[in-house]
Amino acid sequence: MQLPNLQSATLLRRYKRFLADVELNNGEILTLHCANTGAMTGCGEKGDTVWFSTSDSKTRKYPHSWELTQLKNGQTVCINTHRSNQLTLEALQNKIITELAEYDEILPEVKYGVENSRIDFLLKGKNLPDCYVEVKSVTFVKNHLGLFPDAVTTRGQKHLRELIAMKKRGHRAVVFFAGLHDGFNRFTVAKSIDPDYAELLQQAVKEGVEVYSYAVKFDFSHQKPTALYLTNLVNYLE
């Protein structure tokens, strides 16, 4: 997917979960909105280069959005977790996700389940069972191992319960972990961070819920990031 026009700055601090202060090359200090409300472990330290977009909306209190971080180790991570669904939709449309390529109809944000949930994507195809796809962002990486979650996620636990129920009703159910960090080539659940989520995911797999994780690639043109896209399946370590 193509990124909006981005500007670079130096990260000073992140605070109140939603905000980050950065310094431009001319010394000006800006406050960015941060869409990622998680722990963001390893996603940006003071002095890292960040890339931000600017909205034309006159009603936004903070028109600048933190999009990417270039880490000191040379790796890049997308901070804007809204991009994970956009990336996944593009990959589904272009048949990049081979495990789901037989489906022709993609319905986003469909209400389902018994816990007042919305599925990220409901896939439909001729003579195929409906396929419920829940997308999660992978931004936490240690030693080339992608991990989810980076904080306790009761919402994620709810989604797993809903997917298990859909599978029991005869549908396909998928948890899709979309890479937003280009530094991992394997994926697993962060049991030490959210053991309840890890236990539920293990139960979901036993019930037939499918788990896939795809890596991400960032394109840089004229010394700035211009696009990112999902590339290939990475090994899921149960």
Swiss-Prot record:
Taxonomic lineage from the root: Bacteria, Pseudomonadati, Pseudomonadota, Gammaproteobacteria, Pasteurellales
One Pfam family it belongs to: SfsA
Annotated GO MF terms: DNA binding
Family label: Belongs to the SfsA family.
CDD domains: SfsA-like_bacterial (cd22359)
Protein name, entry field: Sugar fermentation stimulation protein homolog
InterPro entries reported in the protein's UniProt record: SfsA (IPR005224), SfsA_C (IPR040452), SfsA_N (IPR041465)
